[in-house]
Amino acid sequence: MERVKERLGVAQKALATLQEVLAETNPTVILRDAAIQRFEYTFEAVWKTGQEFLRSHEGLDVGSPKGTVHGLFQTGYLNARQAELGLKMVDDRNLTSHTYSEGLSGQIFEELPKYATLIGNQSGQ
């Protein structure tokens, strides 16, 4: 339980940094790239929090971000719409790690407010 609280605190701090950059009203390419970087580390903190939560509260051992989303859905912590968005978020996170394209960066940046809202709703922010 204590480990979940620690991870949740890290995830909430990471989310706050993402929300800070998303609040900018006239984002530049540099701000867009900063937001994507903040999304990457926020995502890592969040999925690891979910993984630990499922292990400690539900006895489920999941080894991947998609497994974590599926586990949270199966145990009722996410509804179908949230799980679908969560899986899309995993896919977008994977794309940010393996490719760079101006168009793709713009598309992912447009999705970040939805992802931040989903993360915030699940982490108590």
Regions found by a protein language model. Name each.
Residues 1-125:
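Solvent-exposed interaction patches of small proteins and small membrane subunits
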